[in-house]
Regions:
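Alpha-helical adaptor scaffolds
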Residues: 226-236, 246-309
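Hydrophobic transmembrane alpha-helical segments that form the core helix bundle
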Residues: 107-198
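Terminal, low-structured helical/coil segments at or just beyond the last alpha-helical repeat
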Residues: 321-355
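Alpha-helical repeat scaffolds
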Residues: 203-215, 238-250, 274-289, 312-326, ...
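Small-residue-rich helix-interface/hinge motifs
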Residues: 45-108
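The tetratricopeptide repeat
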Residues: 220, 224, 261, 298-299, ...
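Topogenic membrane-insertion module of multi-pass membrane proteins
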Residues: 1-46
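Polar-ligand-bearing catalytic/cofactor-coordination segments
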Residues: 67, 104-110, 165-233, 237-240, ...
Length: 355
């Protein structure tokens, strides 16, 4: 899909989102509220509608997953996760990646089942259903401004999620439609995500990698290549890891995969004491939101960067503190946790010895 088309769709989606707020203000204005209170209540109503719609979007995935044999692992919005473990539900908190506002994770025993596309389509189907319900509500009540809020809002969210780029539902559906063989990588990714939430201490990252065919393309295939590179890194095979991530950067156009590969190359540069290379990667504008995430593996790398490159001891200690605090909330598998605990200990030793 051309860049102009993508930008056009995003522009239309943003305009629709703005229009939904305008409809909210007008709707409350017609109820007799002053301009100030119409603005306050209208914007609050649309904001809450967005949050509710995101929850319903994920419930759509969960419902379609249930219909096709998926077992619910977690359902979340923002930093909050509802996790199902041993038949019981409990709440958890996690860090949030850029552009990921909500998530559903489910696992399936029969991994040869191609109906994963139906599960991935659940959120989009919810938006279509909500638009139809809003239209029906408008005809029945003649309160079209309130109906328009949900029509326009869901149309905006449908467009952004259906667009086949990045890590959207549309991109994943298109990938599996075009390359059905990638379903194996998709199921492996789901099992990895589920394991990090349910029992991270029982498995290593290397348990969730598999060979990727030379011509494989798409997020799921590239994610598997990333995990293989991270296994090389954890095992100290820096040459192999560097080659893997450089190769990924050369072939991918997925912004998330690019960011992870670049952060991994920053990690390797720090291990190799290549200060200029590390500073070059850290200065990439698109990486800054990722490098600020309060996750153990990122903050450990941030601590080493502040120590080796910036020589800022205050920020080094702050990053170390965050890395330790977030150790359990970062959902690291057994070998990952051991690696970052050791890397943190090495940094603390260097600080104590004044090296």
């Amino acid at each position: 899909m051309g860049k102009k088309v993508i930008n056009l769709v995003y522009t239309i989606a943003i305009i629709f989102l703005i229009l939904s707020f305008a409809c909210g203000i007008i709707a409350f204005g017609e109820l007799g509220y002053s301009l100030f209170w119409a603005f306050v209540f209208g914007c609050a109503f649309v904001y809450l509608s967005i949050k509710l719609t995101l929850i319903l979007h994920e419930l759509g995935h969960a419902f379609c997953g249930y219909l096709t044999g998926y077992r619910l692992v977690s359902l979340g919005i923002g930093r909050f996760l509802l996790v199902k473990k041993s038949g019981k539900f409990y709440f958890s908190r996690t860090a949030v990646f850029k552009n990921v506002s909500a998530q559903y994770i489910g696992i399936k025993e029969d991994e040869s089942d191609q109906r994963i596309i139906l599960m991935l389509s659940g959120g989009l189907l919810v938006h279509l259903c909500l638009m139809l319900l809003a239209i029906l509500f408008g005809f029945l009540t003649q309160t079209w401004y309130f109906a328009a809020i949900w029509i326009i809002l869901n149309l905006s969210l449908f467009l952004t999620n259906a667009l086949p780029i990045g890590i959207t539902d549309g991109a994943k559906i298109w990938e599996l439609w075009q390359s059905p063989e990638n379903v194996n990588y998709a199921y492996m990714s789901l099992r990895h995500s589920a394991q990090t939430i349910l029992a991270p201490e029982e498995c290593d990252l290397k348990d969730f990698v598999m060979p990727v065919s030379e011509n494989a393309q798409g997020f799921f295939a590239e994610n598997m290549l990333v995990q293989q590179g991270q296994v090389f890194l954890l095992e100290g095979k820096l040459k192999e890891a560097k080659q893997q991530f450089q190769s990924i950067l050369e072939q991918t156009d997925n912004s998330l995969i690019q960011a992870i590969a670049q952060m991994s190359l920053l990690h390797i540069a720090l291990l190799e004491d290549k200060v200029e290379t590390a500073e070059e990667y850290a200065s990439i504008l698109k990486l800054k939101p990722f490098l600020s995430l309060k996750m153990t593996h990122i903050q450990t790398m941030q601590a080493w960067y502040q120590y080796k490159v910036k020589k800022d001891l205050a920020k080094t200690h702050k990053a170390i503190q965050i890395a330790k605090e977030k150790m359990n909330a970062s959902y690291l598998l057994r070998d990952e946790k051991r690696y970052y605990e050791n890397w943190l200990a090495k940094l603390e030793k260097a600080l104590s010895e004044g090296i």
